[in-house]
Amino acid sequence: MAVELMTRNYISGVGADSFAVQEAAASGLKSIENFIGLMSRDSFNSDQPSSSSASASASAAADLESARNTTADAAVSKFKRVISLLDRTRTGHARFRRAPVHVISPVLLQEEPKTTPFQSPLPPPPQMIRKGSFSSSMKTIDFSSLSSVTTESDNQKKIHHHQRPSETAPFASQTQSLSTTVSSFSKSTKRKCNSENLLTGKCASASSSGRCHCSKKRKIKQRRIIRVPAISAKMSDVPPDDYSWRKYGQKPIKGSPHPRGYYKCSSVRGCPARKHVERAADDSSMLIVTYEGDHNHSLSAADLAGAAVADLILESS
């Protein structure tokens, strides 16, 4: 209600100002009409032949000039008044008051839920991606391991049944067999490389395709560092030890003129033992030998022959 009263007063004030602006503009336009009439009278008199004397015409021209200046000044002042009135109507700030908040009756609150339509929740989208991923993982399952595990679980059931004839024994055996099948299933679903060489422990497909799909578990390398005196100034002269070694590469060391040589055990084919030899930075007459991995010389002659045949097949392909 307070806002409506203030709005009416504001509108009435604006109406009075607009009426004054209209009056000032009308009087200014009237002054311009008078000025135009005086200008046209001057041109009309100049076109007609003069019958009076020159002095009378000079006085009439002076009177006309003064009247014309007066009319022009009056028109300018009236239009200035119009401009000032327009500027005055644009200044100022509107004031508003907040009306009291209307209290909503509880009857309307009770009737509102009846009018709103009931919206049923949308059904969840079908999980097609999970089914596809499960089917893709099922393709790589090794069923031989599952069959062996299920037979072992059946044997465990029989043993538990004979040992404990109570009612809780079958339930315990079932839970144990279920846990073993789940663990074996999770192990079998892991991604393995079928082309892994069991003798060497290396992936055979990596040499042909350049990519290996074996599990990327980081192996903890066991290192053993010793210092031995150098035999000569040549890096190829390495002090001998209990095993025979074959050099397969070298790498330069930053800040040292002597490179680091890399060797692998050649006593038995496929031995994972490695070592690298480098000059000591504090004493050039000493060598630092770092051993990595353990020696594995327990392979039989048949295993060595099989590994050699596998390597020949890979090299020929």
UniProtKB/Swiss-Prot annotation:
Described function: Transcription factor. Interacts specifically with the W box (5'-(T)TGAC[CT]-3'), a frequently occurring elicitor-responsive cis-acting element.
SMART domains assigned to the protein according to its UniProt record, in alphabetical order: WRKY
Compartments where found: Nucleus
Family indicated by similarity: Belongs to the WRKY group II-d family.
Protein name: Probable WRKY transcription factor 15
CC terms in the record's Gene Ontology section: nucleus
Gene3D superfamilies membership: WRKY domain (2.20.25.80)
SUPFAM superfamilies in UniProt: WRKY DNA-binding domain (SSF118290)
Chain residue ranges for the region called Disordered: 145-186
Keyword annotations: DNA-binding, Nucleus, Transcription, Transcription regulation
Biased composition (Low complexity): 173-186
Source taxon at top rank: Eukaryota
Expression induction or repression: By salicylic acid.
DNA bind region: 234-300
Transcription recorded as keyword: yes
Molecular functions (GO terms): calmodulin binding; DNA-binding transcription factor activity; transcription cis-regulatory region binding
Pfam families in UniProt: Plant_zn_clust, WRKY
